[in-house]
Amino acid sequence: MKTLLLSLVVVIIVCLDLGYTMQCKTCSFYTCPNSETCPDGKNICVKRSWTAVRGDGPKREIRRECAATCPPSKLGLTVFCCTTDNCYH
């Protein structure tokens, strides 16, 4: 009986979502010293980069954020997705 109860407890612990929340850098700069906790349902860190043309010439832009899905890359837009805390490179 004790073995059955212990087995049940182990199965419950393994199967339950224990409230883990993803930590991602969320900013629009090349370096992000701090990370933020992603909201529920957004368990992917996304880094988008592109070149924006402004009055002073082209400039590389970067945006880091939490997301529910990994968006596709497009012409002129590079997307990097990862699923571990602060996993940008």
UniProtKB/Swiss-Prot annotation:
Segments passing through the bilayer: none
Tissues in which the UniProt entry reports expression: Expressed by the venom gland.
Pfam families: Toxin_cobra-type
Renumbered ranges of motif Cell attachment site: 54-56
Span of the signal peptide: 1-21
Keywords: Cell adhesion impairing toxin, Disulfide bond, G-protein coupled acetylcholine receptor impairing toxin, G-protein coupled receptor impairing toxin, Hemostasis impairing toxin, Neurotoxin, Platelet aggregation inhibiting toxin, Secreted, Signal, Toxin
Record bears the keyword Amino-acid biosynthesis: no
Subcellular location per the Swiss-Prot or TrEMBL entry: Secreted
GO molecular function per UniProt: toxin activity
Covalent S-S links between cysteines: C24-C45, C27-C32, C38-C66, C70-C81, C82-C87
Keyword Secreted: yes
Gene Ontology CC terms: extracellular region
Function: Exhibits M2 muscarinic acetylcholine receptor (CHRM2)-blocking activity, but has a weak binding activity toward nicotinic AChR. Moreover, it inhibits collagen-induced platelet aggregation.
Similarity comment: family membership: Belongs to the three-finger toxin family. Ancestral subfamily. Orphan group V sub-subfamily.
Name this polypeptide is given: Long neurotoxin homolog NTL2
Organism: Bungarus multicinctus
